[in-house]
């Protein structure tokens, strides 16, 4: 169940008149999960002002760009942990400064630390005899 929802978008995207620009922002975020993306960078990408981008992005996705980006990063980190990556590798690959930074955000989103998530996977995964 956790895996099924790990890659689901955090909120439904409702295309509107700015849909190509919002899609471009989301695609850019997905391609740069390990980077520190600024609102100015996204505004330049779309040709919109920072404030207009904030308004249309939030109207389309339900979240401001930074929160949406953090959700994307956390879903990727969760997938990596599920696939067997270490917490340090997941943190580095998803742009978190260190394991502690990932831990705070991960726990805030799912209510458990990455270590507890991994431990739960170990308890629920079928054991393969050697």
Each predicted region: which residue ranges?
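Nucleic acid-binding interface residues in structured DNA/RNA-binding domains
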Residues: 113
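Short hydrophobic/aromatic patch on the recognition helix
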Residues: 53, 57, 101-102, 106
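An amphipathic alpha-helical interaction segment
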Residues: 1-30, 40-41, 52
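Terminal helix-turn-helix DNA-binding modules in bacterial transcription factors
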Residues: 27, 31, 35-40, 48, ...
């Amino acid at each position: 169940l956790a895996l099924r929802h790990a890659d689901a978008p955090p909120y439904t995207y409702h295309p509107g008149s700015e849909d190509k620009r919002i899609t471009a922002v989301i695609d850019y975020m997905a391609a740069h999960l390990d980077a520190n993306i600024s609102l100015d960078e996204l505004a330049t990408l779309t040709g919109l002002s920072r404030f207009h981008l904030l308004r249309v992005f939030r109207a389309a996705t339900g979240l401001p760009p930074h929160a949406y980006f953090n959700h994307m990063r956390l879903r990727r980190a969760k997938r990596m942990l599920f696939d067997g990556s270490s917490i340090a590798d997941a943190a580095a690959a998803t742009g978190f400064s260190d394991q502690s930074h990932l831990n705070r955000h991960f726990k805030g989103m799912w209510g458990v630390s990455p270590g507890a998530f991994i431990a739960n996977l170990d308890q629920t995964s079928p054991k393969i005899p050697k």
